[in-house]
Amino acid sequence: MAAYVSPCLTPPDSRVLTVLRKSVLPDHHLGTRVGCLRMSEGTTKRYRVVASHKYESSSIRNSLNSHSTSHFQSQDSFLNLHPEISMLNPRKETSSVPITEDLDELSTPNTYNEARIKVIGVGGGGSNAVNRMIESEMIGVEFWIVNTDIQAMRISPVFPDNRLQIGKELTRGLGAGGNPEIGMNAATESKEAIQEALYGSDMVFVTAGMGGGTGTGGAPIIAGVAKAMGILTVGIVTTPFSFEGRRRALQAQEGIAALRDNVDTLIVIPNDKLLAAVSQSTPVTEAFNLADDILRQGVRGISDIITIPGLVNVDFADVRAIMANAGSSLMGIGTATGKTRARDAALNAIQSPLLDIGIERATGIVWNITGGSDLTLFEVNAAAEVIYDLVDPTANLIFGAVVDPSYSGQISITLIATGFKRQEEGEGRPLQATQADASMGATRRPSSSFTEGSSIEIPEFLKKKGRSRYPRL
């Protein structure tokens, strides 16, 4: 387990540790130094605080403004006025049990300044994706499902208070029957309840499987409410498989067009592209599960960048700067092991099923590399070389790095490409890959002239132009 120990400050007469979820940080108005330990145990456990000193339980409960005789008070009036002096002296303890408190027990959402992220699964497809996120033990986000089908909602692992039935009068809990207009009217009927569910959010993911009734019609309404409230709103949706029929495909395109006008950033994942990653004998149910899992990866790729403390942190303000009013965006997630794992992970991210076309036209890129304690500067450099060699030199780039002991032996890279909105408007059409573009995007690979000992300075990477690209490996 990796640990990072940093000096923190705490009021000399309070003996209170201030705990934040993302890391252990000091109260900024304080005076005496104590040791604060930050530990990462992967994405399934929160950070914990372990006090290296042993205290009497009564001393922890002492109030900041308490005037009663405390463990640190003395017969000396000077020491009573200045208890920090006596705190510096060693003393005997009545308890030998170290204080180990779980962050979930010590913290509440109002005790620290942290971006509040909500994932709203709309309709059957969106709800299934949220269910899968919960099963994968995602942390740092709040899950909601919104549906017209009350029966489907009852079997979800989402907390009952976070299940929002819309259109009670219109549908009577029986669903939208695959009609997007009913889904839209149901969401409109329940706008006040939607606003209450979104209240207090800094960022909202609206996820759905497009082509049906509730998700296709309701997602644009829900996203519009969120954006009108000033919340950073990201839509991440799938398009139907070809075998689902032409009607659902057409409904999906109409729903996507409506959603695009009501979000800051829209990521569309074509389900048909996932078929290339599975065998011909794959059952239909497994194909849909794969689509749900891609939605999960997309949401987690962004939320992890914000919620997991990093070696080089990418905070919410960074992500907002890239994704606010960005229009159509692309995302890639790549993981690799072995001697060339950094370069391979970067290539896998660029060629991810989440990427509909290449990232060369993006005006904003945020990418994050996660590795174990064995992650080296050489590997960070190699991954950066692949990415910066491909993107536009004028693009706004934000980079983050996270060391997570659970990633020992492997590297994962998440890449978000934004800023296609300007090109869309200039060309008078939405960002979509042609058949040729999609084929090229699936096979091309950027070159890398990385050599051992070269600098990790970003400007050096951005100067590299005009080289031969996309050689087949």
From Swiss-Prot:
Residues 445-454 have a biased composition (Polar residues). This is Cell division protein FtsZ homolog 2-2, chloroplastic. It is a peripheral membrane protein. It is found in: Plastid, Chloroplast stroma; Plastid, Chloroplast thylakoid membrane. The gene is FTSZ2-2. Belongs to the FtsZ family. The keyword Cell inner membrane does not apply. NCBIfam families: ftsZ. GO terms for biological process: chloroplast fission; chloroplast organization. Residues 424-455 are annotated as: Disordered. GO terms for cellular component: chloroplast; chloroplast stroma; chloroplast thylakoid; chloroplast thylakoid membrane; contractile ring; cytosol; plastid stroma; thylakoid membrane. Its main location: plastid. One of its GO terms (molecular function) is identical protein binding. It comes from the Eukaryota. The keyword Iron does not apply. GTP binds at residues 124-128, 213-215, 244, 248, 292. The modification Phosphothreonine is found at residue 282.
